[in-house]
Amino acid sequence: KKRESLYIATKTGAQTGEGLREDLKKSLENLRCDYIDIYQFHNPAFCPRPGDESGLYDAALEAKKEGKIRHIGITNHRLYVAKEAIESGLYETLQFPFCYLATEKDLELVEACREKDMGFIAMKALSGGLITNSAAAYAHAAQYENVLPIWGVQRESELDEFLSYIDNPPEMTEEIAEL
């Protein structure tokens, strides 16, 4: 029952189906679990698809059928790959940079994911340290029902700060919006 209460996401930088299978095996061993909840292709230069020559998506589908992964996701920094992944309908999550400094194109990605019932994992929610007000960053992300921010926590105090927002979430006030 403990494992069922925990959601595990990891990624592979593999370039081939065989590489993905090796990475997945290693991840399952290292994490000491039987399955991964979200297994993501990490920042590929293209959008992996069934039947393409990389074999990545086919290997992920096979692992999903075997019960080794539950959801297939993709991480990316390239807008065109992110758009293609959303439009393909093949992915259950997109991990992409997103913070309150987001551009209109970033906001369009969030909306496109929402329309496709696709989760949006916001990486770099503090913009690599450029944003220092975590309450504002949290309040911004909370405005979007399909956005889950991941925080680059480096100290226990930062973890405590973000955990406190679960019980007492900051809201987007005029004061925070002005930051």
Annotated model-derived regions:
Residues S88, K105-L179:
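Structured C-terminal cap/extension of enzyme domains
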Residues K1-L6:
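N-terminal binding-site loop/beta-alpha segment at the start of enzyme catalytic domains
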Residues A9-T10, Q95:
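Short internal beta-strands
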Residues T10, F46, I72, L148-P149:
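Short, flexible active-site loop motifs that bind/organize anionic cofactors or intermediates
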Residues G13, R78, C99, S127, ...:
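Short beta->alpha junction loops/turns
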Residues Q15-E108, R114-I121:
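Glycine/proline-rich, positively charged
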